[in-house]
Amino acid sequence: MKNSFYKSIPTCAWSRAIGLGWDKPYTVRKDSNIDDGPWHGIPLGGFGAGCVGRSSRGDFNFWHIDGGEHTFQNISASQFSVFENSNNKNVVYALSTEANTEPNSNASLSAWKWYPTSASEDDSTGGYHALYPRSWFVYENVFQAQLSCEQFSPVWAENYQESSY
C-alpha cells in the first residue's frame, strides 16, 4: 500500500489491503454477541448514540441503532460509489469488494461493478487504515484520480454531549 499522497494517516494505524481476507482468522472460543468474525472496522457514531460499521472490504455490515440490539449483516445496497471519466474512458465502481451473497439478499445488485479485491498486500487496489476514532480508505491502481475516504467518530474529552451525536 503506497499511501504516498495521503500523509495524515498515522504510521501506527492498523492497515490491511482492501478486501484481502485472512488465512487463519481469529475465532472466539465461545459464542459472543461482540465478535462477529474478522470483517469489522471502526464504528461510525458517538458514544451511546448507536453506530454503523464499515469493514476493510468497504461494506457497511453492523449496526447498533436500537439500544441493546446488535445486528451484523452486509447491507449491499448501502455503498459509496465513484464515477470517473478520464480520457473519454468511464470507470464506475461501488466501493465495496463484494455483494451480499446471503439468502434473501437483493439479487438485482449482482449487476453492480464491485471494487476489485486486493490480490495481496504487495499487489493491492488500496488500503484500509484504522486508528480509533478515525479510519481511512485509500483507493489505488484502479482510478486515474487519487481517491481516499476518511471517517471520524466524535470523541471530545470531558464533553459527553457532543461525543454522543
Predicted regions and their residues:
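Beta-strand-rich N-terminal accessory domains
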Residues: 1-109
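Extended, loop-rich substrate-binding clefts of extracytoplasmic carbohydrate-active enzymes
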Residues: 101-165
